[in-house]
């Protein structure tokens, strides 16, 4: 399976593929790792704008690991995932740019389909940040056959997931806002 690995020489290639018609699945909450960091570093400012109960939701953290899930998938050897990219730095926008770039593939995605927590939206509005560019360390973009079935599997394992788009012909990257 081919993934994108950021190393000292840029992105490396492994086995795998992306082809038109495949679905793009996002697992994990968009920007939530960055939200947790903001919560740690800006607690005093946040306390002036949000109720304590709302901020306590940060204490739950992330109860799942997309990295561990993907590791298990690779070990099992029967995954519908043919290519993947952990979002991390640069957020889901970076993953949307980098993954199809490795395969010279196009994509068509809808931002409103991405799993995102309300607390992330609120923090981004307060600090003028873009949730799709916010650090997304526990977020995974995957190309797969049968994306709907993959989403159901992920959800059964407690990982939020959605089909967010499709692989298309050509090199274009269409990003819609669902409006």
What positions do the PLM features span?
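Helix-biased detector of long, well-ordered alpha-helical tracts
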Residues: 1-179
């Amino acid at each position: 399976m081919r993934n994108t690995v950021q190393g000292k020489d840029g992105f490396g290639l492994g086995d795998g593929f992306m082809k038109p018609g495949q679905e793009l699945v996002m697992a994990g909450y968009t920007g939530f790792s960055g939200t947790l960091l903001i919560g740690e570093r800006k607690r005093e400012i946040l306390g002036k704008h949000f109720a304590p109960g709302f901020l306590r939701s940060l204490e739950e953290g992330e109860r799942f690991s997309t990295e561990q899930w993907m590791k298990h998938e690779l070990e099992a050897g029967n995954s519908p995932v043919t290519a993947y990219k952990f979002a991390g730095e640069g957020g889901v926008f970076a993953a949307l740019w980098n993954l199809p770039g490795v395969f010279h593939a196009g994509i068509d995605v809808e931002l409103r389909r991405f799993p995102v927590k309300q607390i992330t939206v609120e923090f981004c509005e307060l600090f003028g940040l873009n949730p799709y560019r916010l650090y997304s360390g526990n977020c995974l973009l995957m190309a797969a056959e049968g994306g709907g079935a993959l989403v159901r599997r992920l959800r059964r394992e407690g990982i939020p997931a959605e089909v967010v788009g499709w692989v298309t012909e050509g090199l274009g990257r269409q990003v819609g806002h669902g409006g």
